Swiss-Prot record:
It comes from the Eukaryota. It is found in: Cytoplasm; Microsome membrane; Endoplasmic reticulum membrane. The keyword Endoplasmic reticulum applies. This is Protein MOST-1. Signal peptide: none annotated. It comes from Homo sapiens. One of its GO terms (biological process) is positive regulation of cell population proliferation.
């Protein structure tokens, strides 16, 4: 199996074994299911353990899902802490024409 940068949702029948934040958008990256790590309660299955689970457990449905990635808001206070100060304002005029 190939590698996938997304999290995996393991399902046995209709009951999901994975827990954690809501996941969406099934990842179709090829003809075979791709995966990295999944969570079962507080245990993390590594790639090797997950492959063993999939190979030894009939009826396991593997689907690769990823979390929605959102842009993080820019916080000026963090700029001050990381860059040693706020960026200088070049002009108070907008860069494009506003009507």
């Amino acid at each position: 199996m190939g590698e996938c940068p997304h999290l995996v949702d393991v399902r046995l029948g209709h009951r999901s074994l994975a827990t954690g934040p809501e996941q969406s958008d099934i990842c179709h990256t090829g003809s075979e299911a791709r995966w990295t790590t999944t969570w079962y309660g507080s245990l993390s299955f590594s790639r090797h353990k997950y492959k063993m689970l999939a190979d030894l457990t009939p009826g396991v449905e593997m689907s690769c899902r990823h979390w929605a990635r959102w842009l993080t808001p820019v916080i000026p206070a963090l700029w001050k802490a990381e860059a040693g100060g706020l960026p200088e304002l070049r002009s108070s005029r907008p860069a494009w024409t506003t009507w």
